[in-house]
Curated annotation (Swiss-Prot):
One of its GO terms (biological process) is glycine betaine biosynthetic process from choline. GO terms for molecular function: betaine-aldehyde dehydrogenase (NAD+) activity; choline dehydrogenase activity; flavin adenine dinucleotide binding. Involved in the biosynthesis of the osmoprotectant glycine betaine. Catalyzes the oxidation of choline to betaine aldehyde and betaine aldehyde to glycine betaine at the same rate. This is Oxygen-dependent choline dehydrogenase. It comes from Acinetobacter baumannii (strain ACICU). One of its GO terms (cellular component) is membrane. FAD binds at residues 7-36. The gene is betA. It is an enzyme of class 1 (oxidoreductase). The active site is at residue 477. Its cofactor is FAD. Pfam families: GMC_oxred_C (PF05199), GMC_oxred_N (PF00732).
Length: 552
């Protein structure tokens, strides 16, 4: 067979892989092969392109790997959803489109780790800005010419967004006008990755659209990576399968580096399948050990969240939009004008608070939604309602990813070990009680009806714990399973290079050493922008001097 050679092979066309593909091919002499196990991002499919349809891709298998965890021991042994994006755009093709970067202190904390000194907020902010075009223009914190379109909430959006923010302020928490600006702490409007024409701004739309016409970029969809090929400790290529036929094995060789961007679930899985991981485990799976690296698949983290739902006394919620007979008009307005309910992910307000003084920066996140429904579109309440999604941000619980089979189409064993520490339970109890306090402020008096969920009869610690155990769900933020650093459990260095190997990097949410305070997509893109400059041998962007808020 005719084996082609490229300067770089990127595994996974997701939030990070597409950034690398676009940036590396800006150098006209650099050839790149981008491998994606899923299909194209079909632009005529409203399920991925219409922001308000965000629940649809999670219900199917075309765009979602639809992993399930092992029974979670502290969650009544539930097997919990772990949706991950499949197709050009990866999880940016199916996520909730919240543009939230996390707290500056997250990055300051990363930078205290040996080898990560250049991951401070000042080092990273220029790369957040480089990636972004914000619809109201740039400033010290925001970009105005990047590939990711960011939309800000507009006047005239749902009255419940404003009432919920006002209630948070009345409950004694700060107000902030920009959750990605000087001060994350507090309640305020939430930005979203949506284009000016009301379309989802995935990294396929942002980055690949500007790169896919380049002769030095080859994009293969329906190409599932079997393993990375090595000559001793040097990555020399990738073996992959086209379509669903395991006999249809292809190989591509690499001159410079293999860049693994398959995400926090699949990146450790591919490393293990390729012989890089904990040696005793690899031998037990009958895999030849290329390199003993015990941290591969360890340190897995996620955000867990729950919904607090209320009836709405006035007919101002989005409940009518769930009725089939109202949807054609909503769809038409979105399709032809790029406006209306269809053009928003409906997460237009939220916030970050500290549930107690033991935390130096926020540990609880809120997303407000002007309808009562599950994130994946199930269990909609059959009347006007609204809800707060609330969860803790930096749980001490740690999980792991383990291969179950050498079959490249088999899902791995995933265990997040949710709620395994006393801090977890304390934070979730506090979150429920604080949310109830917020919901009972005067700003919500005209709207707030009875509490639907958890239900006001649940009051004791034991009752609240039981609710969390049975009803908390993932926020779809798996991360940290191939962490950056220099300690014995680190998988990559501060530039994403796999320890002990040559010509191999991991660049995606798996390399975060600690999960951030907020949604992951914006930071995953930033990481890829930053490492792209390092791969290209370019000088880092000048450090930012923009200040950030630290609670006294």
């Amino acid at each position: 067979m005719n084996i082609k050679e490229y300067d770089y092979i990127i595994i996974g066309a997701g939030s990070a892989g597409n950034v690398l593909a676009a940036r590396l091919t800006e150098d006209k002499d650099t050839t790149v092969l981008l491998l994606e196990a899923g299909g194209p991002d079909y632009r005529l499919d409203f399920r991925t392109q219409m922001p308000a349809a965000l629940a649809y891709p999670l219900q199917g298998r075309r765009y979602n790997w639809a992993y399930l965890t092992d029974p979670e021991p502290h969650m009544n042994n539930r097997r919990m959803e772990c949706g991950r994006g499949k197709g050009l755009g990866g999880s940016s093709l199916i996520n909730g489109m919240c543009y939230i970067r996390g707290n500056a202190m997250d990055l300051e904390q990363w930078a205290t780790h040996k080898g990560l000194e250049n991951w401070t907020y000042a080092d990273c902010l220029p790369y957040y800005k480089k990636a972004e075009t914000r619809d109201i223009g740039g400033n010290d914190y925001h970009g105005d010419s990047g590939p990711v379109s960011v939309a800000t909430p507009k006047n005239g959006n749902n009255v419940l967004f404003h009432a919920m923010v006002e209630a948070g302020v009345q409950a004694g928490y700060p107000r902030t006008d920009d959750l990605n600006g000087y001060q994350q702490e507090g309640f305020g409007p939430m930005d979203r990755t949506v284009t000016p024409k009301g379309r989802r701004s995935s990294t396929a739309r942002g980055y690949l659209d500007m790169a896919k016409g380049r002769p030095n970029l080859t994009i293969l969809t329906h190409a599932t990576t079997n393993k990375i090929l090595f000559n001793q400790k040097q990555a020399i290529g990738v073996e992959y399968i086209i379509g669903a036929d395991q006999n249809n094995l292809q190989r591509a060789l690499v001159k410079r580096e293999v860049l693994l961007c398959a995400g926090a679930i699949a990146s450790p899985q591919i490393l293990q399948r390729s012989g890089v991981g904990q040696s005793t485990f690899l031998k037990s799976m009958d895999i030849d050990v290329v390199h003993d690296l015990p941290g591969v698949g360890e340190n897995l983290q996620d955000h867990l969240e729950m919904y607090l739902q209320y009836k709405c006394k006035q007919p101002v919620s989005l409940y009518p939009a769930l009725k089939w007979y109202n949807q054609p008009a909503i769809g038409a307005e979105w399709l032809f004008n790029g406006t209306g309910i269809g053009a928003s992910n409906q997460f237009e307000a939220g916030g970050f608070i500290r549930s107690s003084d033991e935390f130096k920066w926020p540990n609880i996140q809120y997303h407000f939604l002007p309808v009562a429904i599950n994130y994946n579109g199930s269990n909609a309440v059959k009347e006007h309602g609204f809800q707060a999604h609330v969860g803790s941000m930096r749980s001490p619980s740690r999980g792991r990813i383990k291969l179950k089979s050498k079959d490249p189409f088999a899902h791995p064993s995933i265990l997040f070990n949710y709620m395994s520490t006393e801090q977890d339970w304390r934070e979730f109890r506090d979150a429920i009680r604080i949310t109830r306090e917020i919901m009972h402020q005067p700003a919500l008096d005209p709207y707030r009806g009875d509490e639907i969920s958890p239900g006001k009869h649940l009051q004791t610690d034991a009752e609240l714990d039981d609710f969390v155990r049975n009803h908390a769900e993932t926020a779809y933020h798996p991360s940290c399973s191939c962490k950056m650093g220099e300690d014995e459990m680190a998988v990559v260095d501060g530039q994403g290079r796999v320890h002990g190997m040559n010509g191999l990097r991991v660049v995606d949410a798996s390399i975060m050493p600690l999960i951030i305070t907020g949604n992951l997509n914006a930071t995953t893109i930033m990481i890829a922008e930053k490492i792209a400059d390092q791969i290209r041998g370019r000088e880092a962007l000048p450090r930012s001097t923009a200040p950030f808020y630290v609670a006294s």
